[in-house]
């Protein structure tokens, strides 16, 4: 019987490298695939893709597997980046990593791998898949500090049935130890952070290349004008840094936080103090719902949800407004709920799916 063929997405980082190594040790026929998803202003100053490809090739050589490089930049721009810009233009705060996983890493990549005769694809995500009576469940990674199921909630049954997450049961320290013990040259390489196509460049500088500035007033809830903002797209709910209005104006010496973005009036509302009531929301409305099993979770049940990556699970309930919109009510008010971000629902360690935060609700 021939070995099952797995195409591994190799980024040049330690996680995907160890994923490829483990699959090779488990007896799979492994092919490495380096994805280039961005070309605009692809300079060494801000983008590490050239070095990442070199690192991936070095690892593939040590493991003894072939490595192919493929360019998905056109697909990325059409399916991910255009949505990213549209959301910022509308005053929301999108999460492109979620869409990149669903549209590029587990769609364009999966299609390409099928053309290579792959039985499965694999990545270095900290997540797990469990087949329960023919239903594929997405589980949290064992390392709670690195769990990436939040970014994978849009994956469907067809995608999960072909997906392997070889390091999902490991802790990060163990991944680095395995890499070092097996002589992988990138065992100590720093983890990548931030949005992949922005790299190390300042976010405001990058966004201004694609969207024009639209300055407006910064106000308090009572209407006092505190200053001017450079454009609502540069701010997100809960933001403290970069407001340009100081930390002591207003009388009580507490720092200022963004509490609301009014796109119609082009007004940025700020409040003083991390625990200001206007920063807390007991409920939210979510749209563009995606459920991993293909079935909507039942109502009248206690679940847990995350409104941002690495947030602690927050107990909640779900009420469906229609088949593509729901209300999520929390047991405790949530801080800085940002429209455009993803809300992801869990039942214990199982990621059920989620949606995009459309609005916050006060009651």
Curated annotation (Swiss-Prot):
Q: What is the lineage of its organism?
A: Bacteria, Pseudomonadati, Pseudomonadota, Betaproteobacteria, Nitrosomonadales
Q: Which parts of the sequence bind ATP? A: 9-16, 35, 124
Q: Which reaction does it catalyse?
A: S-sulfanyl-L-cysteinyl-[protein] + uridine(34) in tRNA + AH2 + ATP = 2-thiouridine(34) in tRNA + L-cysteinyl-[protein] + A + AMP + diphosphate + H(+)
Q: Which InterPro entries match?
A: MnmA-like, MnmA-like_C, MnmA-like_central, MnmA-like_central_sf, Rossmann-like_a/b/a_fold
Region annotation (Interaction with tRNA) maps to: 146-148, 308-309
**Which stretches does the entry tag as region Interaction with target base in tRNA?**
95-97
Q: Which PANTHER family match?
A: MITOCHONDRIAL TRNA-SPECIFIC 2-THIOURIDYLASE 1, TRNA 5-METHYLAMINOMETHYL-2-THIOURIDYLATE -METHYLTRANSFERASE
| Cystine pairings recorded for this chain | 100-196
Q: Which GO terms describe its molecular function?
A: ATP binding; tRNA binding; tRNA-uridine 2-sulfurtransferase activity
EC number in record:
2.8.1.13
Q: Where is the active site?
A: 100, 196
Sites marked Interaction with tRNA: 125, 341
Its protein name is tRNA-specific 2-thiouridylase MnmA
Keyword entries, A-Z = ATP-binding, Cytoplasm, Disulfide bond, Nucleotide-binding, RNA-binding, Transferase, tRNA processing, tRNA-binding
Q: Which family does it belong to?
A: Belongs to the MnmA/TRMU family.
GO CC entries: cytoplasm
Q: Which gene encodes it?
A: mnmA
Give a GO biological-process term: tRNA wobble position uridine thiolation
Please state where this protein is localized: Cytoplasm
Q: Which HAMAP family would you find in this protein's record?
A: tRNA_thiouridyl_MnmA
Role summary: Catalyzes the 2-thiolation of uridine at the wobble position (U34) of tRNA, leading to the formation of s(2)U34.
